[in-house]
């Protein structure tokens, strides 16, 4: 048994790696900058956690996902690793200060890109050796990526300030142009690239047409009642997530709830935990749900709407079947779906007058901390996405109405272009899997016939239906107390 295999078994209890993991880890251990693409459920976290036990110094993980940070830290602690912490907005001032004052004691530190931009945090990080700088969801760096986050664009410069540690840039879905953008912005021209297929052959792909929205609702009810769960229903808006969850609860025997970014942090975590621990059968949600939720046995994902990008679609269906067992993705399509998504994107549009007002507000704000600026804009009534983009442009010195309007219009055009492309992919004749893989510049060789492919190639949906009674669930109040326990954990106690 090699040292790598010994470490894998000692700290994670596995006797073998998932496809692609070992090559990525060996690249990291050789000290090379690495760009890695693994499909959702491919085991990305192990690719940096295992090297952490074989390298001196801290592993610093930048992630935009609060739920992912908390989940990963709890998993590490459950395995007996006390040297893990997350530095984000969920910590109160005292907890945050404790982590920073004891920063030399941590092996794994998760933090948001916003936290990393704090001069105080940066100075503390400079005092410890960093063996690996991990950028999770690396596609957020690129304007071509489906989830561009302006805060990510500064990570290349921040890496230099931290002493230029080796980088691992991770993503589950990215096109060639997005990956090239990531390489350029992080200055990773000589990085080793390990790009695994986005294909998930254990997930059958199905597109169904409905006459109207009412028919789609009826079909969701039917699918949730009949399919083997648990499952996720992705919805276009917060309102739809809440309404569909209500319909499912009133018309089926399934335990359902809704989830979106507008819920209080405690409510979001409670719903996640109830779902993970089988106290809910189905979650109706916006795209705020799923990333960082580690549940391997999700059996189906339903899209009640047209996704905005092919990348988002692949990530969202990838929540299913992470245990490798047969699962199904179903997209429900009806007239007007495209126009609805177009309206949602165009809601991000702002007039020249609104931009001028925002610039005046930003210029009057004495504190130029990005978090403070964002809070000001949110109080002013600017949307989260708009606020992120406007502050990014403002901090770059693009403070004229014309420049800001031009950049925002460009972003909207990119989003509309991507939506047109995914709409075309999902409506064209031919194998759906092949069309999606072609979008990601992958060739596709059909399976030998053992695994169902897509609705064009044909498969029997009854294969994914329940075979017996729904399993009974634990009382919900057990997780209310567990949530209280999680929030009551003292950072001091965890390290001592």
Swiss-Prot record:
Motif (DEAH box): 136-139
One Pfam family cited in the UniProt record for this chain: Helicase_C
EC number: 5.6.2.4
Protein species of origin: Bacillus subtilis (strain 168)
UniProt family annotation: Belongs to the helicase family. RecQ subfamily.
Binding site for ATP: 38-45
Catalysed transformations (reactions): Couples ATP hydrolysis with the unwinding of duplex DNA by translocating in the 3'-5' direction; ATP + H2O = ADP + phosphate + H(+)
Note: The stop codon of ypbB overlaps with the start codon of recS, suggesting they are translationally coupled.
Limits of the Helicase C-terminal domain: 219-363
One term under GO cellular component: chromosome
Biological process, per Gene Ontology: DNA recombination; DNA repair
Recorded phenotype for the gene knockout or disruption: Cells lacking this gene have an increased sensitivity to DNA damaging agents, 100-fold decreased plasmid transformation and 4-fold reduced chromosomal DNA transformation. Sensitivity increases in the presence of mutated AddAB nuclease.
Domain (Helicase ATP-binding): residue spans on this chain: 25-192
PROSITE patterns hit by this protein: DEAH_ATP_HELICASE (PS00690), HELICASE_ATP_BIND_1 (PS51192), HELICASE_CTER (PS51194)
Cited SUPFAM superfamilies: P-loop containing nucleoside triphosphate hydrolases
Name assigned to this protein: Probable ATP-dependent DNA helicase RecS
Record's subcellular location: Cytoplasm, Nucleoid
Record note on quaternary structure: Interacts with SSB (ssbA) and YpbB.
SMART domains hit by this protein: DEXDc, HELICc
Keywords, sorted A to Z: ATP-binding, Cytoplasm, DNA damage, DNA recombination, DNA repair, DNA-binding, Helicase, Hydrolase, Isomerase, Nucleotide-binding
Gene that this polypeptide is encoded by: recS
